[in-house]
């Protein structure tokens, strides 16, 4: 019996080793030598917080672009979406200080100022930009999130504010906007009741993966997304997925993500088989892609459990992965030291 047990354990160990070796070959990230690309000190307009990068190659039909590449990002408590531009993804990146898409022009605005008593959980902001380049209609579609309360001001008391929001069905939701130049955006009325939306196209739909790993979909990128199942349900990262980056390879979706409660928070990757009905989609056990190892990622700080929400001091965490692909080359962008900057890495996905 002991011999059979030993053989079984050895077999499991071999399987784990082979699985680990395969995973290591599947995704490899090599940091850019120019890191960090942006920090909170890059511009006074950044307000001490940088997170949620999204990078695009500026389309040829945009007149007089600021640069070849645009990076949209946010201050977690910010009043507008930030924009940086460069002629190479390695930089140098320069901040377009006026920014784009102010919160006052979205559904996430209300009479100001916000009550000081509620600022820990309730604050007027616009963040987590996701951008789709639509070459057929020569437009950019941007999705952003913020507190949606139908323009109403919440109660001054934090406990009453939370109860009020729950009773009214309010929350941090998503709205879409359009632009022909990447700088001037016009919002569209529909609201999707999810936040941190990332989008990919497949089988005639625009599919979304949002905070906590929640799925959604729509035929029209400007419409409200239908909320569906969660492929991370019943797994080790159920209700922990923070922000995702998405890559489609045929009928396989690669989901890069970081998780609330990890120590340290780091970039992981799971895959989802898209061939079946979306109600049956499941995320595979994740592999590690990148964790804080460099000084600009605060690797010299103590390891602590990450928490939900914003973080206004440097911490040993990397967050908010985004994958940009151009001419067969994938690049991973991510937030450093929690929410103190943006760095990048070249990446191979097999």
Task: Name the predicted role of every residue range.
Residues 321-323:
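Short, surface-exposed beta-strand/loop micro-motifs that present aromatic residues
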Residues 22-128, 132-243, 247-314, 325-350:
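Beta-rich carbohydrate-recognition and catalytic domains
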Residues 1-9:
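Bacterial N-terminal signal peptides that target proteins for export
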Residues 9-17:
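Bacterial N-terminal signal peptides
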């Amino acid at each position: 019996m002991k011999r059979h047990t030993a053989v079984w354990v050895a077999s499991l160990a071999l399987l784990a080793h082979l699985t680990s070796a395969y995973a290591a070959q599947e995704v490899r990230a090599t940091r850019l030598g120019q890191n960090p690309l942006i920090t909170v000190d890059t511009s006074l307009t950044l307000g001490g917080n940088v997170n949620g990068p999204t990078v695009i190659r500026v389309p040829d039909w945009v007149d007089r672009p600021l640069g070849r590449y645009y990076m949209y990002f946010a201050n977690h408590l910010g009043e507008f979406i930030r924009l940086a531009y460069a002629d190479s993804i390695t930089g140098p990146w320069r901040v377009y200080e006026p920014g784009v898409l102010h919160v006052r022009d979205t559904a996430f605005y209300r009479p100001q100022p916000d009550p000081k008593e509620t600022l820990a959980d309730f604050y007027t902001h616009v963040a987590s930009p996701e951008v789709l380049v639509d070459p057929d209609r020569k437009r950019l579609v941007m999705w952003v999130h913020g507190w949606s309360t139908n323009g109403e001001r919440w109660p001054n008391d934090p406990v009453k504010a939370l109860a009020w929001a729950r009773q009214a069905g309010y929350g941090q939701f998503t709205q879409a906007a359009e632009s022909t130049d990447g700088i001037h955006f016009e919002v569209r009325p529909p609201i999707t009741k999810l936040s941190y939306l990332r989008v990919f196209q497949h089988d005639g739909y625009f599919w979304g993966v949002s905070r906590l790993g929640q799925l959604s979909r729509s035929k029209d990128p400007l419409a409200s997304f239908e909320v569906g199942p969660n492929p991370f349900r019943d797994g080790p990262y159920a209700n922990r997925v923070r922000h995702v980056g998405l890559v489609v390879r045929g009928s396989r979706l690669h989901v890069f993500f970081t998780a609330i409660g990890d120590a340290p928070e780091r970039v992981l990757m799971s895959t989802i088989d898209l061939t079946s009905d979306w109600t049956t989609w499941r995320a595979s056990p994740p592999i590690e892609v990148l964790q804080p190892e460099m000084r600009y990622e605060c690797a010299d700080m103590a390891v602590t459990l990450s928490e939900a929400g914003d973080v206004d001091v440097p911490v040993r965490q990397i967050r908010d992965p985004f994958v940009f692909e151009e001419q067969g080359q994938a690049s991973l962008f991510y937030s450093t030291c929690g929410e103190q900057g943006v760095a990048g890495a070249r990446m191979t996905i097999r």
